[in-house]
C-alpha cells in the first residue's frame, strides 16, 4: 500500500507519466498538468502485451502473472496516495508500518515482528483503528478487482493466440464430447431441447457489500481494463485521474450500512446485477453457444433453456419480513426493470432500422405490423421497420402500464407525428417476442440478416428468457409453519381438532380427504390467526401474479425441513385454499393440477438418507401421478448443503448428498419421472461452494441429465456477476459443465467405483464421528464457539434482512443446533479456521489406514485413496476444495481468537483438538495427493492467497483486539464500527464468506 510519489511507469505504453508527491497537489490537477506537458510529444502508443502477435507459449507462470501483480501494486499505491491525502502523513505512516511489519512476520516468521505488531495494534486509538481497518479492507477489494481483470486478460490472450478452447467453455465441452464420440448433432440437439438450467439468486445474511461500494468498484474495474489498451500520454493521465477519483470515492464512502438491510434493499441489490450483466450477457451467451454449435456443424436456434430464478421476496423461511407485500414488490420491481430494458432497446432499434421499402422489400407480416402502427408520419411512410417498431413500443408501454400502473416505467413519445395512443397491451411476452420475430424473419428474407445481429436478435432472445417477469420467484417456507396453518384450517373448519398431534398415516388420510373434497376449508365468516392470514396471503398473491405476469413468474414452492410425506401434501392443500390447485385429488376424472410444483428440501443427514423413501411414498399417493403428468412427468428435489454440513461435517455432508442423489436417480428411473436436482450451494466450501464447473462434473452419474438449478448465494453474487465479462464466463461454465455431465456421465463412473464407494462410506462414518464428537459431544463447545468467533458481532451487523439465528437471544440456552448454517460457516472463516471445510477428514483417513491388519493392506488402502483422487472426479473435487480451504486457514491467527475464551481449560482442550485434526488432515491430504505444499496444482491461486495474508493478518489481529474491548464493556461507537469493518475486510480478503 505504498504511496506512489510518481505515477506507475506503465508496461502497456511507450510513454510514462510522472507526478508530484500526492500531498503536494490535487490528483486531478497533477494529471491535467501531466497531460498538458506531454501533449504534442511523441506519444505514439505501442501494441499492448495482449496483441494478436502475443503468444502464451514459452513464458513462465511468473511472466504470465506479472501484469496481475503490477496491477495490485499500482492500485495499492493509489490507495496509499489517497490515505495520505485524506488522513494525513501520520495515519499513512501507521498503516504502512503495520503493513511492513505484517509482511515481515508472514514471510520471515519473525517472532519479534509479531510482538511488535501486537503492541502497535493495541496502542491504536479508536479513530486510528477505523482508518487502518478501512485501508486494509479496501486493499483486499482492490486486489480482487485486479484478479478479475487478470482472468479476463488471460482469456483474451488465449483467444488472440488461437489457443485450444479452455475447460469450462461450451466449445471445450463440444470438443471433448466429439473426441469421446458423444457429440452427434442429434444428441446435442436433443440435449438443448430438453435442458433447463436456472441459477437462482438469493439474499443471504452474509452479503457484506453495499451497492455504493460495488458501483465504485465496477468503475475501477472498467478503468483498469482501459489500461490494457494502447493509450496516449494524455489518455493515460486522464485514466489515472479517474482511477484516483474513484479510489477517493471509495475512501469517502461509508463501507457499512447504517440500518439493517430491508427486503426491498435486497431486491434492488439483485436487480443491479441484471442491469450490469444478465440483461446483456445472457443473450450474448446464447449467441456464443449457437456459434460454437455452428463450428461443430449444427446450425440451430437453441430454445430458451437457460433462465433466471430468485428467492428474494419469496423466501420466508426464518424471515418474518418476507410477506405478500414483499412478493408483490419483488415482481413489480423485476417487471419494471425488464420493461425499461425492452422499451429502451425497441426505441434504439427504431433509430437504427432505417430500412426503406423503396430500396428493399419487406414481408407481408412486417407490412401488416407497420400498418397497425399508430405512426402516421409522412417522413416514415417508406420505413416499415420503424413504423412497426413504434407500434411495438406503444404496445409494450401499454403492457407495462396495465401491469404496473401509470408512470411506473418511463415512456417516450411514440414518435414525431404520432398522437398519444392507448395501444392494446400484449397478452404475454410470447406475443411480444412473436412481433420481434416478424421483424427478424423479414430482414432475413431481404438480405438484412446482419442488421438483426447487434440489437434485434439479443432483444428477441431476452424476451424469450426474461418474459415480463425477469426471473421466476420461488416461494419457500419451513414445513412446521405449513403444519401450523393447516392445523388451524382443519380445526376452524371442524374437520380435525388437533392435526399436529396425529401420526403420519392419519395426517395423510385427513389431507387426502380434504384434497378430494371440492369444498374449501376456509370460510369468509371465520377469523384466522395472523400467521394463517399471512401465509395464505402469500399464496393468494402468487396466484394473482401468475395471472398478471405469466405462469413462469412464480412456479416453485420449496419446503424447508422436509421430513415426511405430509410435509409435501400440506402445501398442496394450501394451494387448494388459495386458488392455485384445480380439480380434486385422487377422484375419477378430477383433472387435478397444482399451479406450483411442491419441491422438498432435504437438509440434514437423516433427511438426506430418507429422501428417496419420502419421494417413493409421495409418488404412491392417489392422484399424484396425475399431478406429475401435468408437470410433464418432471419433479424437482432440492438438496441442502449447509445444514447437512453443520449436522455431519464436510466429508459426510458431501458423501450423503452423493448417496441421496443416486438413490433418487434409481427411484425416478424406476417410475419414469425426470429428476431435476436443485443444489442449495453456498459461498464457502463447507456450504457446497467451490468452482461450479468441477462441482457439476463431480455429480454422480445420471444425476444432471440436462436439468439443474443451483443457488447463487448473496455473498458471492458480486464476485461472480459484478463484472459483465466474468459474469458471462460463469454462466457459460454452468452450461458447459451440464452439457458434459449429461452426455458423458461415464467420466464420473470409474471402473473401480464400487470399491471407491465402499472406502468413502468407511471414511464418512469415521469423519462424522470425529466431527460430532467435537461439535456436539464436547462439553462447553458451544461456549467455545460463541467466545472464539465473532458470531455475536456478526449478528449485530446490518448485513441482511433475515436474522442470523432462530433462538440466540438467550445466551444460557444457546445451542449449535439452533444456529443457522450460514453464519456458522461465516464465523469460522472470520477466525481463519474454516473448520466447516475440512474437519474430520484427517481422523477419517487415519482410522481407515490404521484399520488395516498389516502393512501390506495399509499400502493397498493408500494406493486405493490415491487412485480415487486420480480417477474419480467426486473425490478429486472434494480434495481440491479442501486443499483450498486449508490454504486459507492460519493456526497462528486462530490461536489469537482462542484467547478470547475466558475458560483456559476449555480453550486449551478444544483448540488443541482442532490443531491436532488440522495436522492430521494436512498429512492425509499430502499422502493421498503427493503434494506437501498447499495448492500445488493451482500456483496462481496459491500466490494470490499468500499475497493476501499480510493484508489479512492485521485485520484479524485488530478484530481480536476490538472484540476484547467490546466484550469488556467498551461502548465506543467507533470501536463497534471497527469490528464490523474488519468483518467486511476479512470476507473480501478470503473471497468467499458464508
Swiss-Prot record:
Disulfide bonds: none annotated. Residues 1-66 are annotated as: Disordered. Gene3D superfamilies: Phosphoenolpyruvate/pyruvate domain. The keyword Magnesium applies. One of its GO terms (cellular component) is cytosol. It comes from the Bacteria. Residues 14-25, 41-54 have a biased composition (Low complexity). GO terms for biological process: carbon fixation; oxaloacetate metabolic process; tricarboxylic acid cycle. One of its GO terms (molecular function) is phosphoenolpyruvate carboxylase activity. Coiled coil: none annotated. Its EC number is 4.1.1.31. The active site is at 204, 646. Belongs to the PEPCase type 1 family. This is Phosphoenolpyruvate carboxylase. It comes from Burkholderia pseudomallei (strain 668). The lineage of its organism: Bacteria, Pseudomonadati, Pseudomonadota, Betaproteobacteria, Burkholderiales.
